Amino acid sequence: MHYEGNKEAKGYTKSISETEQLVRANLSKDGKTLDITAGYVKEYGAKDISKFEFLKDLTSLAMGTNLMGSQGVKYLAQSEVLVNLTSLNLFYNQIGNDGVKYIAVSDNLLSLQILNLTDNDITDEGAIFLAKFLPLFTNLIRLDIRYNKIKEEGKEALRKVQEKISLKHLLLDRVEGFQVKA
């Protein structure tokens, strides 16, 4: 059963020690890379991860298929621990437009070079909002936003901003693939 008030659906039943155990088991020896794809940490697990001080040197975070929703992304985007990230992979997390907005306005994620938001129920609203803030992400060279619900208006906003910034690879949908800037 999945609904907004369901604590289990949000990951509330997983203890912080369980989340920490999962993170430590999947953290690279140098502490720079963490891949917990399909770890299903959900919203509260993302909250725990955002506070783990031992992740302060993390540069690459892969958290696809963790179903954290927009609130989980809010914790990551506002984390004072995860400020060194250069790669963030959040495919299939049901973040929607609200989640994209948390990322777009985050001062803590400005070091990102690679951002994957594939399959997250993002619409034109989220794409247009993200496009407004992309110029602040001066290090971003790859944005993967395929398999969302973005129509032509949102795609056009992202294409226009790509012309003005350092974004070299813009992946909008499965048909057109890479939009490479020369």
Predicted regions and their residues:
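LRR N-terminal entry segment and analogous cap-like coil->beta motifs
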Residues: H2-V73
